[in-house]
């Protein structure tokens, strides 16, 4: 074996370990979603769901979220970061950038992962058709079922997909951790805002996070396979820098 091939072996082993870790993470997220779904269908989460929601409401006035008025407005601003409109604009902007940078497969990955994720979210909501909490403010428009939370699931598969792409484009470990941390934080605060506003049961949000994480990780595991099988010099998914 030539020296160049020997030098590549540690990196290949690391990529294989990372692939196995992603498969395990995806399987864990899927398992968590299935367990939550079964508990919701059987009514096992209702008592805890209601207790958490009521703990976040003003005593004697369940229509009013806990805290100052500005807190509710802040939660509405945060929850907008997980809205279909905002997430769609982010996906379009990222995809156009990747296409202009000639990273066509990366653009295809983003579009496929997020587009199929949006479809999966819709199908899951139709399948479970869980009623929303009765605490929803009258001025918040709701048109879909409660389980799983679309904002939580959409934020997970969009922000985690884009975060993983940006992290992969950097060779700086601290930058990688920062980008992934931002993606996780955005996903987390969007989900929490849905509970605080009373538009979702806590189990809806947990299930949305689990399903969205599974979707994002599963697509990146697929991307690993595509990258590994791509011939040398092909326009595969970027390993280091974008642009």
What are these regions (language model features)?
Residues 46, 50-60, 64, 89-173, ...:
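Membrane-interface loops
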Residues 11-13, 18, 57, 69, ...:
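Arginine residue identity/basic-tract feature
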Residues 1-85, 128, 132-139:
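N-terminal transmembrane-helix/juxtamembrane module of multi-pass inner/ER membrane proteins
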């Amino acid at each position: 074996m030539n020296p160049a091939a020997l030098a590549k072996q540690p990196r290949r082993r690391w990529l294989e370990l990372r692939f196995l870790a992603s498969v395990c993470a995806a399987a864990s997220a899927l398992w968590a979603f299935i367990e939550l779904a079964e508990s919701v269908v059987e009514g096992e989460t209702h008592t805890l769901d209601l207790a958490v929601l009521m703990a976040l409401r003003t005593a004697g006035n369940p229509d009013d979220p806990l805290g100052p008025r500005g807190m509710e407005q802040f939660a509405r601003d945060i929850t907008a970061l997980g809205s279909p409109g905002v997430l769609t604009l982010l996906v379009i902007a990222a995809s156009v950038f990747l296409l202009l940078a000639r990273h066509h497969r990366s653009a295809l990955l983003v579009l496929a992962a997020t587009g199929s994720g949006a479809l999966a979210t819709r199908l899951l909501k139709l399948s479970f058709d869980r009623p929303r909490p009765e605490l929803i403010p009258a001025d918040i428009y709701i048109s879909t079922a409660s389980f799983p939370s679309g904002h939580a699931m959409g934020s997970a598969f969009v922000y985690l997909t884009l975060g993983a792409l940006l992290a992969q484009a950097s060779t700086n470990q601290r930058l990688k951790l920062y980008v992934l941390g931002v993606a996780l934080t955005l996903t987390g605060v969007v989900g929490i805002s849905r509970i605080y506003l009373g538009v979702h049961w806590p189990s809806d949000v947990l299930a949305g996070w689990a399903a969205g994480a599974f979707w994002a990780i599963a697509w990146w595991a697929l991307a690993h396979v595509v990258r590994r099988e791509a011939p040398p010099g092909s326009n595969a998914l970027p390993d280091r820098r974008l642009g």
